[in-house]
Amino acid sequence: MEGASRHGLAAARATLDEATATAPGAPRPVDAGRIAEDLRAVAELLAREPAVRRALTDPGAPVAARTELVTRLFGTQLAPASLRIVHTAVGARWSRPFDLQYALLELSVEALLVEAERDGALEEVEDELFRFGRILDQNAPLALALTDPAAPAAVKDRLLTRLLAGRAHPVTVRLVQQAAADRIHGDVERRLAEFSRIAAARRGRVVAIVRTAVPLSSEVVARLGAAISRYFGRQIQLQVDLDPDILGGVVVQVGGEVVDGSVLRRFVAARRALLR
């Protein structure tokens, strides 16, 4: 997202954080799972209805008019906390109309992660999302079943419930179901990686994806994590992915930056040099 949209997302996130914060001695906390469902539903409507999306992101329309439209469209359907978040979002400026629906989808993920935080399971959910993404990478029939646009969401939900219920945290199951049902982005594996990144960010950590041809001992992982953290100047969370195709060495990806120390890269470089 560009500057204006980043500010809009930050403002809406602050409203989400305020809505889901629980002070000591406060009554029962807001249902973060309900907020997640509401925000996702609004995002999906914006994806289906470009006229509504344009009306809610029109910088020429007064903020009061945009928030009033939200109230007319969703006021009786959304929880009060969800409505406040959407009001904040449409009151912001967005670099592109699509960014509003992307922001609401991201906030729906964060709302589910609040549920995991309350359960003390945020790290567990982050790890399960990453590992299920790797399973999809190695299981083409399963990945195809979850990305099939003709398959109803209910069918995918039943499949995922059968696979994950009792084996993964309930928040993980809901997030994987959300990734599979996402018709806006489509790529389930990429969405799971993004969800894992959002979970890491909520824990104040940055994720590095480490691809290695052979399993690494816990001692090697610890040393590698310390070295990568020093290199990037911040605390880095490692997620190790076995990939025999790189032959040896490691490939480290942090966001859009890739440090390729694989044998495959050196082999390809040597081959190119010989062919010159």
From Swiss-Prot:
Q: How does it sit in the membrane?
A: Peripheral membrane protein
List the Pfam families hit by this protein, alphabetically. Answer: OSCP (PF00213)
Provide GO CC annotations from the record.
Answer: plasma membrane; proton-transporting ATP synthase complex
Q: Does the keyword Ion transport apply?
A: yes
* Compartments (UniProt record): Cell membrane
Molecular function, one GO term: proton-transporting ATP synthase activity, rotational mechanism
- Please give the superkingdom of this protein's source: Bacteria
**Entry keywords, A to Z:** ATP synthesis, Cell membrane, CF(1), Hydrogen ion transport, Ion transport, Membrane, Transport
Q: What is its main location?
A: membrane
In terms of NCBIfam families, this protein maps to: PRK13430.1
PANTHER family reported for this sequence: ATP SYNTHASE DELTA CHAIN
HAMAP family linked to this entry: ATP_synth_delta_bact
Family designation = Belongs to the ATPase delta chain family.
What job does this protein perform?
Answer: F(1)F(0) ATP synthase produces ATP from ADP in the presence of a proton or sodium gradient. F-type ATPases consist of two structural domains, F(1) containing the extramembraneous catalytic core and F(0) containing the membrane proton channel, linked together by a central stalk and a peripheral stalk. During catalysis, ATP synthesis in the catalytic domain of F(1) is coupled via a rotary mechanism of the central stalk subunits to proton translocation.
Question: Oligomeric state and partners?
Answer: F-type ATPases have 2 components, F(1) - the catalytic core - and F(0) - the membrane proton channel. F(1) has five subunits: alpha(3), beta(3), gamma(1), delta(1), epsilon(1). F(0) has three main subunits: a(1), b(2) and c(10-14). The alpha and beta chains form an alternating ring which encloses part of the gamma chain. F(1) is attached to F(0) by a central stalk formed by the gamma and epsilon chains, while a peripheral stalk is formed by the delta and b chains.
- Spell out the protein name for this chain: ATP synthase subunit delta
Taxonomic lineage of this organism?
A: Bacteria, Bacillati, Actinomycetota, Actinomycetes, Frankiales
